[in-house]
Amino acid sequence: KKAFMSDGRLSGKADNVSPDMEKQMTVLAYSDNLGKVNGKTVSGHLLIGYDDLYAIQYFNDNRMAYWKHDGQTDIFDAFAKGQKEYAGMMKRCADFDRQLMQETAAAGGQKYAELCALAYRQAISAHKLVADKEGNLLFLSKENFSNGSIGTVDITYPSAPMFLCYNPELLKGMMNPIFYYSESGRWNKPFPSHDVGTYPQANGQTYGGDMPVEESGNMLILATAIAIIEGNADYAAKHWDVLTTWADYLKKEGLDPDNQLCTDDFAGHFAHNTNLSIKAIMGVAGYGKMAGMLGKKEIADSYLATAREMAGKWISMAKDGDHYKLTFDKSGTWSQKYNLVWDRLLDLNIFPSEIAETETAYYKTRQNKYGLPLDNREDYTKSDWILWSACLTGNTADFETFMLPVWKYANETTSRVPLSDWHYTSDGTQRGFQARSVVGGYYMRLLEKRLKK
């Protein structure tokens, strides 16, 4: 370091490093002489890459990273192409940066844009991109800082808004492994698996607890969202049989879920979950919506009617004065009903708009300095779900009321880690989780603007 500071040259040897330290602490140093510094801008760049040889084991088949094109491209080809196309790529990056900041600011204000910018890279980088033998895209998430599950459905679900906005093919890549797992007969339960393994081995579910209503609702809702974004239900048509199985499961078991896990599994099992029930109703309605898009009118009418019947029962079972309960059997409780956001965004229109308005008004009485708690049981929250709850009514003032404390948390938290989605609302400190893809859910407001323009 001292030599470099004096003459700008690297000696090739690190200062005061013992042989043992050298084994443990590999150091790479690089210098580039940019000439005399004056008023004119001078820049340089360095290409750094990593070849993991095989990225993912997918049902006992080792798959290379997508960029390698089944071995037709190696790391040296990638470096050469990167160098050749450097200027153009940097311009594309800068152009997209501007686009993202402009359209998210237009959707929700400058502070919302800053939250989205903070989330963008993290939401993508928590995945590996590969293809299966047939060339189907697989965009496999890792559950960072929880249990390391790969391809978790209830990680895909909260992250989806960003990918629906910018690249629905990547969302399909998250869903493809779950469809394959069921359609291949490897998973034979009447609801989707929770995951397809433990990173980096996607050989089948390893998580100890199923989430039957949770994952069925997630897959049906996301398939519906893709259909609306693309203007057709072709993707759903490819998987219609298994989607039908899941929709029928929700018709039977979804209105008043038994003692099972949902995506907020850190809070433990509990029965009669009203927000989970909404997810089931949205899943049934979504199936009906897709059936209509596929010309299956009788099926569409039947499932949409069932969803409305379920919603009517939900209202009478969940009502608790000026709000709606956490669980059907416990008065004096409350929770964020973030799953309700899809009713308006996907034009399902199953619930009266008064439900969202009533809940939103009540949430304002429960908000803390750094956000709205997840429910009445704890002070902590999930910031991705807050950004969904903020979109329940479509009202700009309501959105800002709930979004701004999340920005304040991200800006002021003393937990200086890759953005945590699970924090305490009273003091803004991390409760757990970090560097996870679920922050793609921050893009719900942008998705709303795109769907409702």
Language-model regions, residue ranges each:
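Aromatic-rich carbohydrate-recognition surfaces in CAZymes
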Residues: 67-90, 148-257, 273-291
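Terminal, non-catalytic domain-edge segments
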Residues: 405, 420-453
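Aromatic-lined, polymer-binding surfaces characteristic
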Residues: 113-132, 151, 184-193, 210-217, ...
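Acidic/polar, glycine-enriched structural segments that form the non-catalytic walls/loops
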Residues: 1-151
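Generic recognition of stable, solvent-exposed alpha-helical segments in well-folded globular domains
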Residues: 23-25, 29, 41, 45, ...
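Extended ligand-binding clefts on enzyme/binding-domain cores
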Residues: 1, 143-155, 161-168, 187, ...
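Extended, well-ordered alpha-helical scaffold segments
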Residues: 78, 115, 169-181, 219, ...
